[in-house]
């Protein structure tokens, strides 16, 4: 394993590294915990290693053994970002490099785990059964299981997961045996195995009332019974995308490629969990127009999952490459040679938006392609920068060496680093080594400026604008009408708009948003103010308020809020309280907040009332955006737990450990099963939990914050948002 300095992990893979983990998990919806054991196979990397250190967050540790014997261990003082290091002392310091050990840990998760969202029946489509799903990226896997939670450590895993008999369990792996029903008939156990090494952030679990539809021999679409057919229709091109990706990147190594369409609180557009991509239901447009997200997630099967950024500072190697692959897949599948340039232009625009927002919040340093993340939560640095600035770098290299040569290089790059990790310097060296005959074309390529300069790239790309011009031309027609203070346009071209692809419609609306944002837009055009009658005429022509396309709906809402057209506010509230996709929720909450007055108050109150609906990651980020301090106390369990029910006992070796470890700096120690489980039971019985149920969906007419009547409020000015994190334009995690 290549050495690395991972600032986001407290583990020690440079001394002792995990290679495989066997998981036994028991999912308890009543208490909202997973009781589990993790048996690690580890390898000594450095002679004389004395400890195996893992990352944990909000986990209760029960017992620890090394090669079957009780081990000394401690959970150190909790770091506010990185959690608590689990320090397991090895029985001797005489280990040599290459030796292998087995380390077994019993533990249980917390209802406050940031990796797990527990949904009550009311938050599911069916409304009758609870649901859970996990999200490990970037550094949340440590709240699902003790792990070396850094991308540089790649492991294989197997798992046996016990769930209620009515439920189906899915994981980021291949099913290794048929489900087994318990003798009492109240539970089933599902078995999984992942043979391709992967980082811990890709360990994923979903449990719910699920059905599947086959798309091909290696692709299924999973979702709740009432949604699965819609999802199967919208994602019916999955096999076609996968075949196109293989032509560009090489053989698909993961066996199956299934898709799970999750409940609406899933915080991202998609997550590339191996063998089982998670996606948001906001992609279900009914016309397959948002299926490009599937192409993005499929691309990650090579760039991100097979070849992985070594640390989060080099995240662009995951996402920039994936944008490049996605755009090539979609160009091939659509048969439109202009798709690549058109989509790249939209990505460049989202990069400009991200840079502007980071600059306004005083966090421009996070727009470096290789940022310094020391002391920074990787979630706070998340934006379109690694996606689109990373893509821009690759696209510029492609321009210099030629398209065919770069396509061949992409395959060689993936082959060279498959099942491994890579950083920016290694990528640079590998690229230059493959093009010794292109010295002239690459001589003035400033690698350091690309990697370490904040802001936009110094080299502005040139793209074919043909597909853009139609959309922007119609937008300019409406803008000219606004400048002329008329209430409609002579020719709204309704039929043309309806025939456009989703990205073209978004381009039209985004152009109008840009024109209404400042004194001049990104192209220097003078800004305009859109009157209420003009917006109503636009809505009548294109049915924008009623659209089922989430991307179009989002842009329309932004445009109306920028124009202070408060008729849209109830619709915005309905949107942000009906789904938790951060690409949409965060900007719309910020837009409401920026309006000031009643809009700001309503944004804050709505979020507070609905906070438990959102995934913990989304909840945390929106709270930062709105400067809200949420009580993150645990929820009260429906029934109590005992040490025995957790599979833990008060053994003498566990209890004596606290003394044998000496004077550790730990304040939050777990001296074994007794102290760990007892602390957990105290936490569970503290009564501090917030109820996770929600009431209704925020309803169209009155809006989720309460059906107060709206009045025009004076604009209090632009509020500088505290959080630096920005949404991804239209890329996968958005």
What is the meaning of each model-derived region?
Residues 1-255, 382-385, 401:
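Acidic/His-enriched low-complexity segments
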Residues 46-48, 94-98, 179-187, 286, ...:
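Short, glycine- and charge-enriched coil/turn segments that flank and shape catalytic ligand pockets
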Residues 192, 221-480, 485:
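Hydrophobic alpha-helical and helix-loop surface patches within well-folded domains
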Residues 383-384, 389, 406, 418-423, ...:
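Long, ordered, helix-rich scaffold segments
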Residues 394, 720-721:
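Structural signal for hydrophobic/aromatic residues that build the beta-strand cores
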Residues 659-688, 692-694:
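Amphipathic alpha-helical membrane/lipid-surface binding segments
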Residues 689-717:
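Membrane-penetrating hydrophobic segments
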Residues 702-712, 722-734:
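Short hydrophobic alpha-helical membrane-entry/anchor segments
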């Amino acid at each position: 394993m290549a050495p690395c300095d991972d600032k986001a992990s407290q583990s020690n893979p440079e001394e002792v590294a995990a290679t495989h983990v066997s998981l036994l998990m028991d999912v308890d919806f009543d208490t909202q915990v997973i009781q589990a054991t993790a048996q690690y196979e580890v390898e000594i990397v450095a002679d004389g290693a004395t400890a195996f250190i893992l990352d944990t967050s909000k986990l209760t540790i029960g017992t620890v053994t090394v090669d079957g014997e009780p081990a000394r261990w401690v959970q150190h003082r909790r770091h506010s970002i990185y959690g608590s290091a689990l320090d397991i002392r090895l029985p001797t310091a005489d280990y040599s490099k290459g030796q292998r050990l087995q380390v077994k840990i019993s533990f249980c998760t917390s209802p406050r785990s940031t990796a797990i969202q527990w949904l009550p029946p009311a938050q599911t489509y069916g409304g009758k059964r609870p649901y859970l799903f996990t999200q490990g990226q970037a550094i949340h896997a440590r709240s699902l299981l003790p792990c070396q939670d850094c991308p540089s450590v790649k492991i294989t895993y197997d798992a046996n997961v016990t769930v209620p008999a009515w439920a189906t369990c899915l994981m980021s792996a291949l099913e290794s045996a048929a489900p087994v029903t318990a003798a009492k008939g109240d539970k089933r156990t599902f078995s999984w195995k992942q043979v391709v090494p992967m980082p811990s952030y890709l360990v994923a679990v979903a449990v719910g009332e699920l059905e599947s539809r086959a798309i091909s021999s290696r692709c299924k679409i999973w979702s709740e019974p009432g949604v699965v057919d819609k999802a199967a229709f919208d994602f019916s091109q999955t096999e076609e995308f996968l075949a196109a990706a293989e032509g560009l990147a090489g053989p698909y190594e993961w066996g199956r490629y299934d898709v799970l369409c999750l409940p609406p609180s899933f915080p991202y557009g998609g997550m590339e969990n191996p063998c089982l991509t998670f996606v948001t239901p906001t992609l279900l447009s009914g016309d397959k127009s948002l299926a490009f997200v599937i192409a993005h997630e499929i691309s990650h099967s090579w760039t991100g999952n097979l070849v992985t950024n070594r640390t989060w500072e080099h995240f662009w190697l995951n996402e920039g490459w994936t944008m490049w692959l996605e755009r090539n897949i979609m160009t091939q599948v659509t048969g439109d040679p202009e798709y690549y340039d058109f989509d790249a232009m939209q990505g460049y625009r989202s990069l400009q938006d991200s840079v502007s927002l980071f600059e306004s919040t005083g966090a421009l340093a996070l727009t470096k392609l290789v940022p310094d993340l020391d002391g920074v939560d990787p979630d706070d640095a998340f934006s379109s920068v690694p996606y689109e600035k990373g893509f821009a770098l690759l696209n510029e290299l492609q321009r210099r060496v030629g398209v065919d040569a770069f396509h061949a290089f992409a395959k060689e790059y993936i082959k060279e680093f498959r099942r491994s990790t890579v950083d920016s310097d290694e990528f640079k060296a590998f690229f230059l080594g493959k093009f010794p005959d292109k010295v002239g074309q690459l001589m003035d390529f400033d690698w350091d400026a690309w990697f370490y300069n904040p802001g936009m790239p110094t080299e502005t790309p040139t793209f074919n604008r043909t597909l853009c011009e139609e959309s922007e031309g119609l937008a300019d027609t409406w803008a000219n009408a606004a400048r002329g203070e008329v209430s409609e346009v002579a020719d709204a071209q309704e039929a043309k708009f309806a025939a456009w692809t989703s990205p073209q419609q978004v381009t039209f609306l985004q152009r109008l948003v840009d024109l209404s944002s400042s004194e001049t837009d990104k192209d220097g055009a003078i800004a305009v103010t859109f009157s209420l009658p003009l917006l109503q005429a636009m809505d009548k022509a294109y049915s924008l308020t009623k659209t089922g396309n989430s991307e179009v709906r989002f842009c329309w809402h932004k445009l109306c809020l920028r124009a202070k057209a408060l008729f849209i506010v109830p619709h915005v509230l309905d949107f942000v309280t009906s789904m938790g996709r951060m690409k949409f929720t965060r900007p719309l909450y910020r837009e409401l907040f920026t309006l000031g007055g009643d809009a700001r108050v309503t944004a804050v109150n709505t979020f507070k009332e609905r906070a438990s609906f959102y995934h913990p990651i989304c909840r945390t980020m929106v709270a930062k955006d709105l400067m809200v301090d949420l009580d993150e106390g645990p929820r009260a369990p429906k029934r109590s737990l005992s040490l025995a029910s957790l599979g833990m006992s008060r053994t003498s070796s566990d209890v004596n450990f606290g003394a044998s470890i000496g004077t550790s700096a730990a304040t939050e120690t777990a001296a074994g099963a007794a102290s760990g489980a007892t602390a957990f039971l105290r936490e569970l019985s503290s009564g501090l939990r917030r109820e996770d149920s929600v009431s209704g969906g925020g309803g169209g007419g009155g809006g989720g914050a309460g059906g107060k009547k709206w009045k025009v409020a004076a604009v209090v000015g632009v509020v500088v948002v505290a959080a630096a994190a920005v949404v991804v334009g239209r890329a996968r995690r958005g």
